Amino acid sequence: MRDSSTTASTKSSPLWKPFASNCCSVDDQTVFGNLSRCRPSRSEFSKNHLGPLPSFRRLSFADLSRSSSARINEDLAQTLGADLVDFQMCELKMITQSFSGNYLLGEGGFGKVYKGYVDDYLRQSLKAQPVAVKLLDIEGLQGHREWLSEVIFLGQLKHPNLVKLIGYCCEEEERVLIYEFMPRGSLENHLFRRISLSLPWATRLKIAVAAAKGLAFLHDLESPIIYRDFKTSNILLDSDFTAKLSDFGLAKMGPEGSKSHVTTRVMGTYGYAAPEYVSTGHLTTKSDVYSYGVVLLELLTGRRATEKSRPKNQQNIIDWSKPYLTSSRRLRCVMDPRLAGQYSVKAAKDTALLALQCVSPNPKDRPKMLAVVEALESLIHYKDMAVSSGHWPLSPKSQGGKVSPKVRGDHRSGRKSAPGSLRS
């Protein structure tokens, strides 16, 4: 049965709004102009035609004058209406104590993320709540294009498993995004940082289902969206460990009509990107499915997608784990030792087989995300714990005399991982 949260869009009620007629964009294949140098839009972008959501090229900061910033704000306000709050920089400085280090949550390719608090004292009608304030570093890896892409996508998409964008700020060279605050941080931190308690099996499965629902929602839109950077650091967790996808800076509209794929410059994160995308630049929703399979393997094993410090045949999680994924008795040799056998044997095996299908070298052999959701939801209630069914602890024979649970647990050595909610 289809989950209603993953099929929210219908042909009679499309989610996308067209840009205002005086606003333009740049796509990887077709040039329509850009927000700082607007030209009349094409005739097909009429009031009754919902064209594909535009993506935007990086603009030099020298081009982002007062007038261009004002035009961007005007265009976004016309397009998104009251869906997002257009914050002023002085307001953001007020709620972060001028971006004080005491309020710093993390740092990554975009810049720094600070915690703040908004309410109706700051702006009338604002819901009182903590927020995450993401401040663009003008010397960083991401820029205006990614900032604008995120505003456009998250400004129009609403789903329980997508992080909520509350507002933005565009003043001269400053680019800021304001999100709902996710108190549990990123999945990356919970899986790979020693200071975090191990996630129980039921919680891992819950996270896997919720993240799959987020991707399924994007893929099942009338005009599908390819997330393009699915990884543990972009999966954020609320107080109940409900997973939400964040960081839409690399998201892209999928193929339309008779086209089987879109061709684009290869971007994303090494270890998660699908091989056909890396080699050809051909991008489909099945590219996201591959990345999802990698994250499933991380949830099962507690290992990162790539670990250069390991022996060569163990550096890539797929190459290392694949020989163990089709047998329950062999699978236990690569299960996260922090679970200590507290996982369902059947659910773990079925999850491993699903992950193996997701990372198939042939994109056509990978399942759709709606099918992934259905498969994982059927595993939630299994109670055959490995620790009580003879599958744990590992015997020396099952280990082949090579790897002990204690040694395998050392992959979380003191090396500090990058903060969660940002692209590494």
UniProtKB/Swiss-Prot annotation:
GO terms for molecular function: ATP binding; kinase activity; protein serine kinase activity; protein serine/threonine kinase activity. The modification Phosphotyrosine is found at residues 179, 277. The modification Phosphoserine is found at residue 233. It is found in: Cell membrane. GO terms for cellular component: plasma membrane. Keywords: ATP-binding, Cell membrane, Kinase, Membrane, Nucleotide-binding, Phosphoprotein, Plant defense, Serine/threonine-protein kinase, Transferase. It catalyses: L-seryl-[protein] + ATP = O-phospho-L-seryl-[protein] + ADP + H(+); L-threonyl-[protein] + ATP = O-phospho-L-threonyl-[protein] + ADP + H(+). ATP binds at residues 105-113, 134. The modification Phosphothreonine is found at residues 264, 269. PANTHER family: OS01G0588500 PROTEIN-RELATED. Interacts with the Xanthomonas campestris effector XopAC/AvrAC. This is Probable serine/threonine-protein kinase PBL15. The lineage of its organism: Eukaryota, Viridiplantae, Streptophyta, Embryophyta, Tracheophyta.
